[in-house]
Design a protein with these regions (language model features):
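Beta1/beta-strand and adjacent pyrophosphate-binding region of the FAD-binding site
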Residues: 25-37
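Bacterial N-terminal signal peptides that target proteins for export
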Residues: 1-9
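Flavin (FAD/FMN)-binding glycine-rich loop and adjacent Rossmann-like elements that form
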Residues: 148-149, 153, 160-171, 175-478, ...
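N-terminal Rossmann-fold NAD(P) dinucleotide-binding loop
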Residues: 40
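Bacterial N-terminal signal peptides
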Residues: 8-17
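Conserved N-terminal/central alpha/beta ligand/cofactor-binding core
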Residues: 46, 52-53, 58-144, 149, ...
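Sec/Tat signal peptide C-region and signal peptidase I cleavage site
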Residues: 19-23
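Terminal recognition/anchoring or ligand-binding modules at protein termini
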Residues: 507-641
Length: 641
């Protein structure tokens, strides 16, 4: 009898032990990406392309975040900046629909697509990477922190059976919508608006507050044909005056801002291929103010019911009040019971207190700042600063669109000050509240994720617990290899001769672009075929060269000189190399440059004629190679030679 009892007890112990093992799955990877949204999926793909074992853990069944699961499938900005994985994704969108003209269906964007197509494309791109694993329907629960400040992994729970997943990683990327990983790990962050006195930004915020931007629960409507009535059941609390001022056809309360479009124009704002319409309308439409940041997952879900009801009331308004009865919730988009998006469109969450804080001044006047952060650029954007605050009367309503040119996001914005093992992406990077209004847009967030993937992969490969130890130039070099932009030049693309030289020299501050605020698509022009005077060229050299006694002498004599010629450029470049590169033989005579001219992709060698900026960039890159020779830190300051 005793033997039977002991055997039974042993079997019970084995059964319980087996259940515990099954209930808690443990994985070890090089790079863990928490969240498969816009930044998360590009971070995962890019890290895997660098041959490191990468895992993306995503809460939903979709990939792509705001581009797909949130339904914001009309991209904002970067039409002339098809950088890196954003450009690759867009090419796949073009291929799916039949070219750029087929996705220019609305007027808010140049690129519109169905959310489920975006999800399909991201899954196809992810499946092509052998070093990448995706796990769906696991919700982030907590970060694993060692010795108080090193993030070494994360814990998740399965949303279907509540089993646990524990992942240990050499590097963790926070690609969550609201910055949940850094909060769990105790990494310092900000929430809401900073006082103007704190940031030095001229936006007239008198005191720091915790106000974030409105969010939106997006719906995709489908045209079911004339005569078909798709009107939904009247939502509780419906009052058409809630949407007064959403369009000119329904504008009664003249104390509200006068709408700029009629209702027909409003509907086509984000018309998608397939006779579908995205609903993401800020002007008395379906925006809502909810601050979900400090809530539990269950509390967030409860609050989001309000956002869904806001959108349903707006849909009923369109159908019942404006007569668009033929437009109903698409039955072939989201795998949800209510046919709404899988997740909300979160415009803002926690913002990292990073190695640097990227502010409006760094964008509006990048060459005039104490720290030349543009030299550390890893992602580009060109959208204006766009804040949604109408649904929160406590929020300042005066911000508007601060005029800025296009910009480069600095690498230090992805890095915590003192915690190691963590890289921050998505909308959680270290930018001011104001700047978040432009860095939050889809193409920009995709590129932030790609840079995060490079940084984390390099840290894992080089066995660096702290990604801050990875060279800025090393990250930038790999991004260039991956066809990503460092500098936001609207007139220099991948097909432009000298693209890579221009990008490298621009990131050194040697030859500068001209910024131009421009409505919904800001610009920076490099003007590759333009010429410059000797003085204009030499006056930019101090931006590059920490040690050069010759510059002041050159500048004094240059005031009387005209346009910089090819021959004179070679002379200066020889002098630059000699004075900044110790123990280097200078052999770049005009004759030798002439023999290499065509090899470098140039034509019409004539020492007497004026040199173009493109040619000058190529000469500087090939002869001096300042991008490789001069290291920069996260502040953009040169640390060598």
């Amino acid at each position: 009898m005793l033997r039977i009892k002991l055997t039974y007890l042993l079997l019970c112990c084995l059964l319980v032990s087996n259940q515990l093992i099954q209930a808690q799955r443990v994985l070890h990877v090089d790079v863990l990406v928490v969240g498969g949204g816009a930044s998360g999926i590009t971070a995962g793909i890019q890290a895997a392309r660098l041959n490191v074992k990468t895992l993306v853990v995503e809460e939903t069944t979709w990939l792509g975040g705001m581009l797909s699961a949130a339904g914001v499938s009309a991209t904002d900005g970067n039409h002339l900046l098809p950088s890196g994985l954003w450009g690759e994704f867009r090419e796949r969108i073009y291929a799916h629909y039949g070219g750029p003209s087929k996705v220019a269906t609305g007027w808010v964007s140049n690129t519109h697509f169905e959310p489920h197509v975006a999800n399909q494309i991201w899954k196809e791109m992810a499946s092509a990477e052998k070093s990448l694993q995706i796990i769906h329907q696991y919700q982030f629960r907590s970060a694993i922190v060692q010795k108080g400040s090193h993030i070494s992994g994360a814990r998740f729970i399965n949303l279907q059976n509540e089993s646990q997943l524990v992942v240990y990683a050499k590097q963790v990327i926070d690609a969550t919508e609201l910055g949940d990983v850094m909060a769990s790990a105790g990494v310092p962050f900000d929430v809401g608006m900073e006082a103007s006195a704190t940031t030095g930004e001229n936006v007239q915020v008198p005191a720091t507050n915790d106000i974030i931007q409105d969010l939106t629960y997006v719906a995709i409507l489908k045209d079911y044909g004339r005569g078909v009535d798709c009107t939904i059941v009247k939502p509780a609390g419906y009052d058409p005056t809630e949407f007064d001022g959403s369009c000119l056809d329904f504008y009664q309360d003249t104390t509200r801002i006068k709408p700029g479009v009629d209702c027909a124009k409003m509907i086509t704002y984000a018309k998608l291929p397939g006779n579908k319409y995205m609903l993401n309308w800020p002007g008395h439409g379906n925006d809502i103010y909810l601050n979900l940041i400090n809530l539990t997952p269950a509390e967030r879900a409860k609050e989001l019911v309000k956002a869904k009801q806001q959108t349903l009331r707006y849909i009923y308004f369109l159908q019942h009040q404006l007569g668009y009865k033929n437009l109903g919730l698409a039955d072939d988009e989201f795998p949800t019971s209510d046919r709404l998006a899988l997740i909300p469109y979160n415009r803002e969450g926690r913002r990292l207190k990073g190695v640097i804080r990227f502010k409006v001044q760094d964008i509006s006047k990048p060459f005039d700042q104490e720290f030349p952060l543009y030299r550390t650029g890893i992602a580009v954007g060109d959208y204006p600063i766009d804040h949604h605050h109408r649904k929160n009367p406590a929020a300042p309503q005066h911000l508007g669109f601060y005029p800025i040119p296009s910009f480069s996001i600095p690498l230090g914005a992805l890095l915590p000050v003192s915690h190691s093992g963590l890289v921050v992406a998505e909308k959680g990077i270290s930018v001011s509240n104001v700047v978040n209004g432009t860095t939050r847009l889809q193409p920009c967030v995709l590129l932030i994720g790609q840079a995060a993937g490079v940084l984390a992969a390099l840290a894992a490969q080089n066995k660096k617990n702290d990604a801050r130890q990875i060279s800025v130039r090393e990250v930038q070099s790999i991004l260039l290899q991956q066809k990503a932009y460092l500098m936001p030049y609207a007139d220099v693309n991948l097909s432009t001769p000298g693209f890579y030289s221009i990008q490298r020299i621009g990131a050194c501050g040697f030859l500068r672009g001209k910024g131009q605020p421009n409505a919904w698509a800001n610009r920076t022009w490099f003007e590759p075929d333009s010429t410059m005077t000797v003085y204009q060229f030499l006056s930019q050299l101090p931006a590059l060269m920490p040690v050069n006694n010759q510059i002041s002498k050159w500048l004094e004599s240059a005031k009387s000189e005209g346009l910089l010629s090819v021959g004179r450029a070679v002379e200066f470049i020889e002098g630059i190399k000699k004075s900044t590169r110790k123990n280097t033989n200078v052999t770049s005579s005009n004759a030798q440059v002439s023999s290499s001219w065509t090899t470098w992709g140039l034509s019409n060698y004539n020492p007497e004629r004026a040199i173009t900026k493109r040619e000058l960039a190529i000469l500087l890159d090939k002869i001096v190679d300042p991008f490789s020779a001069f290291s920069v830190n996260h502040l953009g300051n040169y640390t060598s030679p």
